[in-house]
Amino acid sequence: MPVTSTDTVKDMTTRATQAPRETASYAILETAREQVLERGEGLNESQLIHILELPDDAIPEALQLAHEVRLKHCGEDVEVEGIISIKTGGCPEDCHFCSQSGLFDSPVRGVWLDIPELVKAAKETAATGATEFCIVAAVRGPDIKLMNQIKFAIDRINEEVDINIACSLGMLTQRQVDQLAEWGVHRYNHNLETARSYFPEVVTTHSYEERLETCAMVKAAGMELCCGALIGMGESLAQRAELAAQLAALEPHEVPLNFLNPRPGTPLENQGIMDGKDALRAIAAFRLAMPRTVLRYAGGRELTLGDLGTREGLLGGINAVIVGNYLTTLGRPANADLNLLVELNMPIKEFQKSL
């Protein structure tokens, strides 16, 4: 018989619970089972800190619970997405983690893709079974030239490829939001990245409030909001819990979970790699904060978690993946993720064109 995803996690939990349990450490898991799994209410900020502080031997049970929450409140399907950068490098913002900033001595140089290349990438993405294709630009916000290119790209892709189109173009004006919605953009990505209290440590050229304004306009226009996190930048566990709670309050459709991959030439190039067990705790915590949200594996997981950790995360609350490469770093081969989903008996979400 094939091994199911639930069976695999139960095996992990059995091994963990053979050791003596520390009552105080596990109490939050009992609370979460009743509050999140049974009632569908996410953990609050103070509760999330306890998840992030769980001892190592409690991680399998936390992941098991997060997986059960995901299955009950989101279903079995895993959403697959590909991303492409229409404009790489030369960004005027100073996000300390990003090698695309033109303010740092980074090896990334400015590059524009033409429309035929975007269409080709969309076709290749759809061929993997992906239902989402996100067009990304390294900008503070789009100018008229970029908006015109986006419109042309959307039209061409829709003519030739059955896939939902998402965009990530920085901060938007109301007019730009309305245009993207009118053009049929399915989902818009604009990450909070980190907690409000830590944001000034990693970005100084724009404010947290400016990011929130774009997120609010996107939701009001009827597009799905994709709003994610980048963890492992030196934030405290309390700030990690703060971020999860702030994202939960925003109620995005999707939260991509990134782990810092320190890039040469950026202010965070010497930041240590996040511990894999801390990453797994974070995955469980974010799922328990947002039981109904699409929680997507995004950048840095290959470095932080490796193959085994990637598997554990998919059995611990993750229900979406980005296949292939990222914007400036290499990802896992698409087939590696797709084969893993088959092995775990996790069906890929089928394409349904948004209206």
From Swiss-Prot:
Cofactor(s) of this protein: [4Fe-4S] cluster; [2Fe-2S] cluster
Recorded superkingdom: Bacteria
Keyword Iron-sulfur carried by entry: yes
Sequence positions that bind [2Fe-2S] cluster: C134, C167, C226, R296
GO BP annotations, alphabetical order: biotin biosynthetic process
InterPro entries found in the cross-reference section: Aldolase_TIM, BATS_dom, Biotin_synth/BioAB, Biotin_synthase, Elp3/MiaA/NifB-like_rSAM, rSAM
Keyword tRNA processing part of the UniProt annotation: no
Biological pathway: Cofactor biosynthesis; biotin biosynthesis; biotin from 7,8-diaminononanoate: step 2/2
Domain Radical SAM core span(s) in chain numbering: 76-301
Residues reported to bind [4Fe-4S] cluster: C91, C95, C98
E.C. numbers: 2.8.1.6
Keywords: 2Fe-2S, 4Fe-4S, Biotin biosynthesis, Iron, Iron-sulfur, Metal-binding, S-adenosyl-L-methionine, Transferase
UniProt cross-references to SMART domains, sorted A to Z: BATS, Elp3
Similarity comment: Belongs to the radical SAM superfamily. Biotin synthase family.
Self-association state and partner proteins as the record states: Homodimer.
Designated name of the protein: Biotin synthase
Record organism: Paenarthrobacter aurescens (strain TC1)
